[in-house]
Regions:
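Alpha-helix initiation/capping motif
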Residues: 55-56, 121, 162
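Beta1-alpha1 glycine-rich phosphate/pyrophosphate-binding loop at the start
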Residues: 2-76, 171-179
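Hydrophobic, well-ordered secondary-structure segments
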Residues: 141, 166-169
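FAD-binding core/adjacent interface of flavoenzyme oxidoreductases
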Residues: 1-6, 66-159, 174, 178
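Conserved phosphate-binding and hydrolysis motifs of nucleotide-dependent enzymes
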Residues: 9-14, 115, 160-165
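Residue-level preference for nonpolar/small residues embedded in alpha-helices
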Residues: 60-61, 103, 164
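Glycine-/small-residue-rich active-site loops that bind phosphorylated ligands and cofactors
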Residues: 13, 38, 84, 99, ...
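Short glycine-/acidic-enriched loop or helix-start segments at secondary-structure transitions
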Residues: 17-18, 42, 87, 121-123, ...
């Protein structure tokens, strides 16, 4: 049996790294851990769901865990968050977000690609209200779309002038919102 490679994070970087390891080593045992429920989705396409340039949310998902297994013989575990790394013992501790079960996995090589989390400064009043959204994954964009699609929700403020923020503003405008 080949070396045991664990990848923390299953979106763009982690999914690419896992596929690359497979191309370099056909014998490796590769497992990807993703804390969210989707793996390998198109981050850059998320805003285009708001204007229906991307027709449905599932079109944003490029590969499923089953697809990774069938195409690359890579085990992908969604809803599994890596909680701790023991570098000396070469083990990680993982928590299944659905069951709460925790377990350990040993590795020969570990790839870290955990992604990011949006910052919501606690000093800004109202930043955690239910009508304040962040856009990081498929679930986030679906929630924003559902809220923005309600009758009477015509005015939208987008905070963040990076590519995703600008594309969210553009696509909300395309969807008829005042941005």
């Amino acid at each position: 049996m080949g070396k045991r490679v664990l990848v923390v994070g299953g979106v763009a970087g982690g999914a690419s790294a896992a596929a690359r390891v497979r191309r370099l080593d056909a014998e490796a045992s590769i497992t990807v851990f993703e804390r969210g429920e989707h793996v390998s989705f198109s981050n850059c396409s998320l805003p285009y769901f708001l204007s229906r340039t991307v027709g449905d949310a599932e079109s944003l998902v490029l590969m499923t865990p089953e697809g990774f297994k069938a195409s690359y013989d890579i085990d992908v575990r969604i809803n599994n968050e890596v909680c701790a790394i023991d570098r000396a013992a070469k083990k990680i501790r993982v928590r299944n977000e659905l069951t709460g079960e925790e377990y350990e996995e040993a590795y020969d090589e570990l790839v870290l690609s955990p992604g990011s989390s949006p910052i919501r400064p606690r000093s800004i009043e109202g930043v955690f209200l239910p009508h304040v959204f962040t856009v990081r994954n498929v679930n986030d964009i679906v929630k924003l779309d559902k809220y923005a699609g309600q009758e009477g929700k015509a005015d939208v403020v987008v905070i963040g002038g990076g590519f995703i923020g600008l594309e969210v503003a553009e696509n909300l405008r395309e969807a008829g919102k005042h941005v």
